[in-house]
Regions:
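S-adenosyl-L-methionine
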Residues: 1-43, 51-60
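SAM cofactor-binding core of SAM-dependent methyltransferases
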Residues: 40-85, 119-130
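Intrinsic disorder/low-complexity segments
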Residues: 86-117
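A short acidic, Gly/Pro-enriched loop at the edge of an enzyme's catalytic core
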Residues: 134-143
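A short SAM/SAH-binding and catalytic strip from SAM-dependent methyltransferases
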Residues: 142-161
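A short glycine-rich, Lys/Arg-flanked "PGG" loop and its adjoining helix->strand segment in the class I
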Residues: 163-177
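Conserved beta-strand signature within the Rossmann-like core of class I S-adenosyl-L-methionine
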Residues: 178-185
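Class I S-adenosyl-L-methionine
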Residues: 191-196, 201-246
Length: 246
């Protein structure tokens, strides 16, 4: 389903530029300056509206995160949601940004000045994840999260799947040794396909289940907005964790 275009989406994203870093290489190379710490960097491919990354970054505070989303009108929702969760303000009625001190920064203004505020351990990027990741240095990432990606069900589209062997080889290169991939999907066909691809790859599957919400792993599971909706409709969630053995 195509998402309705967000009113003033580009302008809203621009106001929160402090939380956006579309140059993933710069983020990796200057992570200590950007995050003000030396914690390992993790990546979420396809962050959607940001429920997962918002909660994951709270649960695992000793990591930094880059949340990548291809669709700008989806990513702006995630950025705003995260900013509000950090106490940095909220969306103003006119589409501008209302800071925590109640100052209104209207649309068309320069980016919101968050100097002195703690921006937390997440930055966002809009663009094609594969293109961004292909430019990253070897062994520069601690973990990758792939939640409910497009299954590309049509015949002949297998190579577009984010768990196709060529993607797994890319992930292996940029992940540290023993770095992990966390993969969730409601699509059984995609999951079985992914299990086969991982077996051909440098990764070792250390955990898998066809019913995440009935497993012990559910105790620490953080739901995405998509996952919550489809679980309520009776869909079972498949999950695997794979470790990089390059």
């Amino acid at each position: 389903m195509r998402m309705k275009k967000k009113r003033h989406g580009a302008e809203r994203m621009y106001l929160l530029s402090s939380l956006v870093c579309n140059d993933a290489v710069n983020l990796v190379e200057n992570r200590e300056e950007i995050f003000k710490n030396s914690y390992p960097l993790r990546i979420e491919i396809g962050c959607g509206k940001g429920d997962f990354i918002k909660e994951k970054s709270k649960a695992d505070k000793d990591y930094n995160y880059l949340a990548i989303e291809k669709i700008a009108d989806v990513c702006v929702v995630a950025v705003e949601k995260y900013a509000q969760s950090r106490g940095l303000g909220c969306l103003a009625p006119n589409g501008g940004w209302k800071k925590s001190d109640s100052t209104i920064v209207p649309l068309g203004s320069s980016p919101v000045d968050f100097s002195g505020d703690d921006l937390g351990n997440v930055r966002f990027a809009v663009g094609d994840a594969a293109e961004m990741l292909s430019k990253l240095p070897d062994s520069s990432i601690d973990a990758i999260f792939i939640n409910f990606c497009d299954p590309w069900d049509k015949k002949g589209y297998e190579k577009r799947r984010l768990t196709y062997i060529s993607f797994l080889e890319l992930y292996s290169r940029i992940l540290s040794k023993k770095g992990k991939i966390y993969f969730k999907t409601d699509n059984r066909g995609l999951f079985d396909f992914s299990l086969e691809q991982f077996e051909k790859s440098p990764f070792k599957i250390v955990y898998s289940t066809y019913d995440l919400h009935s497993s012990d792993m559910n105790k620490t599971n953080i739901e995405t907005e998509y996952e919550r909706n489809f679980t309520e409709k009776g869909f079972k969630i498949n999950m695997l964790i794979a470790e990089n053995n390059k």
